[in-house]
Amino acid sequence: MASFASLVKKELTQLEVHPEHAKAELSALIRMNGSLTLMAHRFVLNIQTENPAIARRIYSLIRQVYHHEANLVVHRKMKLKKNYQYIVRLTEGVNDILSDLSILDPDTMAISTTVPTSVLKEPQRMRSYLRGAFLASGSVNNPETSRYHLEIYSLYDNHNAGILKMMNHFHLNARTVERRSGYIVYLKEAEKIADFLQVIGATNAMLKFEDVRIMRDMRNSVNRLVNCENANMNKTIDAAQKQIENINYLKNHVGLDNLPAKLREIAVLRLAHPDVSLQELGAMMPSGQISKSGVNHRLRKLNQIAEGYQQPEDA
């Protein structure tokens, strides 16, 4: 069964986007998962992923935006594992594409690790860049698990800061933490995770996430209610048991006939009906119905009398 993160990424790879927004998505995918090698005095761009749908997405976006045909190379990561590594390899127009995506400075040939200013200026480009970043190195827990968590990993601090800035532009209350090998921006609140999925275009995944979250919260609420009712029931049972013990004590040591009429009446009734509620006891009173609080008052009085007789024996 596919993980929830895989379902999110599959949906994202099927979105149709405007060429300018496709550039922002590509910029994130290449900046985060790409590597350059020099072959025959020219750059070769390799973009790696373990997800075949993401590899197809990268291939399609390059062809859509830049009209270049990339090569798709497949490697098995380890002989004993089924995992494959998919490499989208581009050998033509690499310099121009990387320059256009603000990854490579054409004059100095320096690589930029920051989110492009052109992306930060326009909300739809930010959405697309975040989509590419999530496809490149994002993960999200199944909403049915014990904790909600979504994160995007960045190798560089300045790039991580850009991701954080964009996410909080959409009021996601994102946070960041440094790891030994890099940095992550993360979300812990269920509502913010759902909002992020909406921001990057994973509408179906967002709806599924919300459905599961609501059902989970409902189950938790029901469980809390049941636990509360059970606790109250246990308290009621304990109280009734204590009442019966005290009434029996009075019966054996004092005699119920020696009690005031109202207390004698409730004592006899409680012994005859040990399992009924206070409200039901009140309705059964031979001398006339009384309220739940009236029943409770008389039973408390019986408890006080019994405890008063018991104290000298305990001393």
Curated annotation (Swiss-Prot):
<dbReference type="GO" id="GO:0051301">
    <property type="term" value="P:cell division"/>
</dbReference>
<dbReference type="GO" id="GO:0003677">
    <property type="term" value="F:DNA binding"/>
</dbReference>
<dbReference type="InterPro" id="IPR039518">
    <property type="entry name" value="WhiA_LAGLIDADG_dom"/>
</dbReference>
<dbReference type="Pfam" id="PF02650">
    <property type="entry name" value="HTH_WhiA"/>
</dbReference>
<protein>
    <recommendedName>
        <fullName>Probable cell division protein WhiA</fullName>
    </recommendedName>
</protein>
<keyword id="KW-0238">DNA-binding</keyword>
<feature type="DNA-binding region" description="H-T-H motif">
    <location>
        <begin position="277"/>
        <end position="311"/>
    </location>
</feature>
<dbReference type="InterPro" id="IPR003802">
    <property type="entry name" value="Sporulation_regulator_WhiA"/>
</dbReference>
<keyword id="KW-0131">Cell cycle</keyword>
<comment type="function">
    <text>Involved in cell division and chromosome segregation.</text>
</comment>
<comment type="similarity">
    <text>Belongs to the WhiA family.</text>
</comment>
<dbReference type="InterPro" id="IPR027434">
    <property type="entry name" value="Homing_endonucl"/>
</dbReference>
<dbReference type="GO" id="GO:0043937">
    <property type="term" value="P:regulation of sporulation"/>
</dbReference>
<dbReference type="InterPro" id="IPR018478">
    <property type="entry name" value="Sporu_reg_WhiA_N_dom"/>
</dbReference>
<dbReference type="Pfam" id="PF10298">
    <property type="entry name" value="WhiA_N"/>
</dbReference>
<dbReference type="InterPro" id="IPR023054">
    <property type="entry name" value="Sporulation_regulator_WhiA_C"/>
</dbReference>
<keyword id="KW-0132">Cell division</keyword>
<dbReference type="Pfam" id="PF14527">
    <property type="entry name" value="LAGLIDADG_WhiA"/>
</dbReference>
